[in-house]
Amino acid sequence: MKVTTEQLPKRIVALEIEPDAATIEKELNKAAQRIASKVAIPGFRKGKAPRFIVENYYGKAAILEEATDEIINVAFRAALEQENIKPVAQASLEKLEPEPFRFRILVPVEPEVILPDYKAITVDLTEEPVTDATLEVALDQAREKHVVLSAPEGEPEAAEGDQLTATVQTLVDGVPLHKLDEEDDDDDDDDDDDDDDDDDDDDDDDDDDDDDDDDDDDDDDDDDDDDDDDDDEGEPTTLIMEERRIVPELYAGLKGIKAGETREISAHLPADHPDARVADKDVVFKVTVSEIQNRQLPAWEELPGLEEFEGDLDAYKADLMERLVKNSGDHHRRNVLNQYLEEVVAATSFDVPDALIAERAHELLHEQVESLARYGINMEQYLQIVGKTHDEAVQELLPRGEESLKSSLVVRKIVEAEGLSVDESEINAEIERILNDFPDAQRGPARRRLEKELRPQVAGSLLDKKLQDRLVELATGNAAA
């Protein structure tokens, strides 16, 4: 067998393979036997006609066609072994010549990843401090979970602490925000249409008389539509009558409002408002209240019990502060890891087969759909919702797939470069630590699972922890030389 190799970009190895005569003859004989077993040839039982008889009936070309796939498979496997090539994705046949029998096949191989001097890369992120103000916010949030709503008697007026259900329309210079969006879209469309106006003018002249009659009929309908748009105040929303929760002018303007009442309240929104359409602008809020409810918050002393905490309020506050500090530290650690990996990936040299990127994008799509399974959404339904075919959905995820793959490759390279590993004693110790959290009656079955089918996951978790610890050391410049 003759094999020549050629290294192509994106880690593709092209193999030119010419199988030896013995391989071809062997597969031709098998192909003739398969054909003979499928058809009736006079004078022979099925599968018993010799090859030359089958050739006489069906021709050499039919036998070669039947044998081609197996010749390629056998020769390809032999060539991979001979050249010590390990595919990482499906190979593709590029060219096939029957006389003499030879073919060219493209094989994706292991990506090439050249790390930068990753030990010289550091990130400088300041951890947000957990203050008494942070604790106060968390306490308020915990207390809010247990608020009790009640309908007041009579015709109540909105007062401090009440909860309002209302529709709110925001107007800028008398124009609702949704109208501003439509005008922006229309401006864009007008720009696109300008180039076509000259071409359409002649046709429009011919149609003007007919259109005038139609337009007259539609005028009344259009007026009705405009009125509906102006009255469209959006979906009901919840407003809490506390000055720190809503715009001060809105808070003041809603005092004393009753259910069923509509008020227009002027306000000036700050320059740092998250919605650029209203930032540093005078606006009018058109508010229609549909319901007013009293809010009864639990007494502070009741909060520990409501949160199923064993201890008094001071102990609960101390525990909450401890959790806030831990969460803040974990969040900071994740940010450090993410930024460090982003910078290392950006400085790394990659040569990656497209097939691996597509494979990762395919995995991301299926992970995305699996996360929706609890809502009863399967792949077919998901694709209908997004209006895409499976291939289109994968194509859309290629950039994320490439980013995810490169990050994984960098992590794997760093694990190798740092010599990170876990031994059996570490795995056993981790299993014992996990078992301590189980009741005595459940430890036996849990141990069997952990020591057998879950052992690889325990090892992977330990290695991941070591890796994260090392990456944080590297990222913060605290790694030992």
From Swiss-Prot:
This is Trigger factor. Keywords: Cell cycle, Cell division, Chaperone, Cytoplasm, Isomerase, Rotamase. It is found in: Cytoplasm. Involved in protein export. Acts as a chaperone by maintaining the newly synthesized protein in an open conformation. Functions as a peptidyl-prolyl cis-trans isomerase. It is an enzyme of class 5 (isomerase). Residues 161-298 form the PPIase FKBP-type domain. InterPro entries: PPIase_dom_sf, Trig_fac, Trigger_fac_C, Trigger_fac_C_sf, Trigger_fac_ribosome-bd_bac, Trigger_fac_ribosome-bd_sf, Trigger_fact/SurA_dom_sf. Residues 182-235 have a biased composition (Acidic residues). It catalyses: [protein]-peptidylproline (omega=180) = [protein]-peptidylproline (omega=0). It comes from the Bacteria. It holds the Pfam family Trigger_N. Residues 173-245 are annotated as: Disordered. Consists of 3 domains; the N-terminus binds the ribosome, the middle domain has PPIase activity, while the C-terminus has intrinsic chaperone activity on its own. GO terms for molecular function: peptidyl-prolyl cis-trans isomerase activity; protein folding chaperone; ribosome binding. It comes from Herpetosiphon aurantiacus (strain ATCC 23779 / DSM 785 / 114-95). One of its GO terms (biological process) is protein unfolding. One of its GO terms (cellular component) is cytoplasm. Its EC number is 5.2.1.8. Belongs to the FKBP-type PPIase family. Tig subfamily.
